[in-house]
A protein has these predicted regions:
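Bacterial N-terminal signal peptides
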Residues: 7-17
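Divalent metal-coordination and catalytic microenvironments
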Residues: 34, 50, 55, 79, ...
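Histidine-rich, glycine-flanked metal-binding segment
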Residues: 36, 40-83
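Metal-associated gating/positioning segment near the N- to mid-region
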Residues: 80-148, 172, 213, 234-252
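Acidic/histidine-rich helix-loop elements
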Residues: 93-112, 168-185, 254-260, 328-335
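Divalent metal-dependent hydrolysis catalytic cores, especially in the metallo-beta-lactamase
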Residues: 117-140, 157-164, 197-207, 228, ...
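Active-site core of metal-dependent hydrolases
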Residues: 204-339, 358, 365, 385-386, ...
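His/Asp/Glu-enriched, well-ordered alpha-helical/loop segment
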Residues: 224, 328-332, 340-427
Length: 449
């Protein structure tokens, strides 16, 4: 059916008694007039109309082809870009920009569930992030906050949580959210415990410090329970072992100052991406935090905005401020200026090797606030890494939904899918940084901004 005939059909349906009854029975919204970037990568739809009925999208068309139901709440998107809600595939809602991890981990565990994690979730939503993958947190707190968001008790994106990291040995003082494994049986038992608790994904790190059999056990057990596995890619051996074990998605572009990935690693990646029967190999490079560090160091007033205070008590805000008072002194970033020049080459290598990149930010790490990390990552991809805006947007919408196995429900603005939609004044395909100030946020049909 053509878009025009489909629009006429919808208009007739809505004008019928059945259509009128449906409109009266459920809250209906109509986003009218904007340029729709639907997530599929095709030409934007000018003068778009998106009809939202309850939590789902009822119809998509144009002003010329799709009538607005009588009594619907009309939301003008004239002069705006309309997009699927953004995904951030690598966040840490248990932290919020504080620079001293030891202090944070000792001071705030009893405030994670009720204060800090809800504040982080709310900030992400206000930034236009309607879905996020939370990679590393206390198990019970992560599940509780995810479920509270899903029940509508906490404003936030739909969260896909990993719970604790799985690794060889937890760093001292981090046992609450890092689980060590000792042998194959223990590796499988830890993953089963996560699966039975209801996590959405398993996060594996430091796999180069584990035995090969342990790494395979983690991945195999996760897959047995229908869970994808993400793994760190800081060091070449982490990548080698992860690929051999069947890791689904790698995180980061490495903390080394090596100018590029070794040839054998690239060859192994290409071997994996050639096996399309296994689906795409996903990779979340998280480059913005490294790339923008020197800018923040030299322009610390950029940290003075109060947007990242949302939901945080004043004493926590002051504690965070104190921790980042001297950006140039932070141990976390001392090697970053030497890493920065390697990022473009590594991104190019990954793209040339057939990897599907995903937008993710490591949001929550020192000076990386949930309120603005995601648009900054998109901006760096386009402005510095040479990635086309449409490709970057699809890496924050369509591809993450596919990676998480939920593309039937989210990731594009399509009839029948959940109404996760954002709108922003201006043309984001020309000026991607317009996403720094999202004007409209709908999640599951509820307007939050």
């Amino acid at each position: 059916m053509s878009r025009t005939s489909n629009g006429i059909f919808v208009a007739l349906l809505l004008a019928s008694p059945i259509g009128e009854a449906r409109a009266a029975a459920a809250p209906v919204k109509a986003l009218v007039g904007g340029t729709l970037i639907d997530g599929f990568g095709g030409p934007p739809i000018q003068d778009s109309v998106v009809i939202v009925d309850g939590e789902r999208i009822r119809a998509v068309g144009t002003v010329a082809t799709l009538a607005v139901p009588e009594g619907a709440e009309v939301i003008s998107t004239e002069g705006m870009s309309v997009l699927p809600g953004l995904w951030d595939m690598h966040v840490h809602v248990m932290i919020n920009g504080h620079a001293d991890y030891v202090h944070w981990d000792e001071t705030y565990p009893d405030r994670f569930r009720d204060v800090i994690m809800p504040a982080s979730a709310h900030q992400l939503l206000m930034a236009g992030v309607t879905s996020a993958r939370d990679l590393g947190g206390p198990l019970e707190d992560s599940i509780a906050v995810r479920d509270a968001v899903n029940r509508g008790e906490i404003p936030g994106p739909t969260l896909y949580v990993s719970g604790p990291f799985i690794q060889h040995r937890p760093y001292p003082g981090t046992e609450l959210f890092r689980w060590g494994v000792e042998g194959v049986d223990d590796a499988r038992a830890k993953v089963r415990r996560l699966a039975e608790a209801g996590v959405d994904v398993v996060k594996l790190i430091d796999q180069d410090q584990m035995t090969v059999d342990e790494v395979h056990a983690v991945v195999d057990e996760a897959h047995r329970h229908g869970l994808t596995v993400v793994a760190h890619a800081h060091r070449p051996e982490e990548i080698r072992r992860g690929l051999a074990a069947g890791v689904d998605c790698f995180e980061h572009t490495g903390l080394s100052t090596a100018p590029e990935y070794p040839p054998d690693v690239i060859a192994a990646i290409r071997e994996r991406t050639a096996q399309m029967n296994r689906g795409p190999l996903f990779w979340t490079p998280t480059v913005e935090g490294l790339y923008n560090y020197t800018y923040l160091r030299d322009n610390p007033e950029k940290l003075d905005g109060d947007e990242w205070h949302l939901g945080l008590p004043e004493e926590i805000v002051l504690d965070i401020r104190r921790s980042i008072a001297h950006p140039d002194r932070l141990p976390y970033f001392q090697a970053t200026p030497a890493r920065k020049p390697t990022l473009r080459r590594k991104i190019d290598q990954l793209r040339e090797s057939g990897v599907q990149l995903l937008i993710g930010t490591d949001s929550g790490i020192p000076m990386k606030f949930h309120i603005d990390s995601t648009w900054n990552e998109l901006d760096i991809w386009v402005r510095v890494m040479g990635i086309e805006p449409m490709e970057a947007i699809r890496s924050a919408t369509y591809w993450p939904a596919l990676a998480m196995g939920v593309a039937d429900d989210v990731g594009t603005v399509t009839e029948g899918k959940l109404a996760d939609i954002i709108a922003v004044k201006g043309d984001v395909l020309r000026y991607i940084d317009k996403l720094d100030d999202v004007d409209i946020v709908l999640k599951h049909g509820v307007r939050h901004k």
